């Protein structure tokens, strides 16, 4: 069930989907408001019909709680088979590069930190950790500042938060190692890159997919 404060952008991130696709799949006329009692499809119409979520309360796009206070939305969908995961970027084949050169200042913690924080200076380059397509570029999620979300497959998304400058737009294809932003401290008390990896919408430790330094 969607909690008060959730938005289409948040729902997309938590379910590994492009929020604009969710708008299209549900024929939503006004993306700024989700109605009471509305059931949202979070997969294409041809997919499992069980991938729907009920709305608990109307919310506006800009009214988003801090990531530290949020709870994940768990979809009732079936897990993909081993073969389908392997075809769409399996654990065995999916590898990232470091999105920034700084040191890790905050490690992954599923209950407290949905990603890792990497230190740096204003203007330091932020790189795409793998090939993919930009599904979000903006500042619509409170607590993330200037945010970029890249979809790499039906399985994996990466998120890059607190940037000073965003250098890519939505629907743009990016290559591994491409500069997509400049590090900053938007919606943060210090300059850093908050980097998340989502597998089927669930936060996982990106360090397990990164090369050792």
Q: What name fits each language-model region?
A:
Residues 1-144, 149, 153, 169-175, ...:
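Extracytoplasmic low-complexity/disordered linkers and repeat tracts associated with LysM-containing
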Residues 61-73, 161, 198-213:
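Short peripheral tails and domain-boundary helices/loops at the edges of structured domains
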Residues 144-146, 156, 189-193:
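A short pocket-lining beta-strand/turn micro-motif at the edge of beta-sheets
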Residues 156-164:
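Active-site region of chymotrypsin-like
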Residues 172-213:
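Conserved, short, structured surface segments that act as functional micro-motifs
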């Amino acid at each position: 069930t969607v909690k008060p404060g959730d938005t289409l952008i948040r729902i997309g991130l938590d379910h590994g989907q492009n929020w604009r696709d969710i708008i299209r799949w549900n024929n939503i006329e006004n993306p700024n408001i989700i109605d009471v009692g509305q059931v949202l499809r979070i997969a294409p119409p041809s997919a499992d019909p069980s991938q729907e979520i009920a709305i608990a309360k109307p919310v506006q796009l800009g009214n988003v709680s801090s990531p530290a206070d949020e709870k994940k939305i768990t979809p009732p969908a079936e897990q993909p088979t081993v073969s389908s995961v392997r075809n769409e970027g399996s654990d065995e084949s999916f590898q990232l590069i470091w999105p920034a050169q700084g040191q890790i200042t905050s490690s992954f913690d599923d209950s407290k930190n949905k990603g890792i924080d990497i230190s740096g200076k204003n203007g330091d380059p932020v790189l795409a950790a793998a090939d993919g397509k930009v599904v979000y570029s903006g500042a619509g999620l409170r607590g993330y500042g200037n945010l970029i979300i890249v979809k790499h497959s039906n399985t994996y998304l990466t998120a890059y938060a607190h940037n000073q400058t965003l250098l890519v737009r939505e629907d743009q294809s990016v290559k591994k190692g491409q500069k997509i932003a400049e590090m900053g401290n938007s919606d943060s008390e210090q300059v850093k890159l908050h980097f998340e990896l989502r597998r089927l919408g669930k936060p996982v430790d990106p360090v397990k997919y990164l090369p050792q330094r």
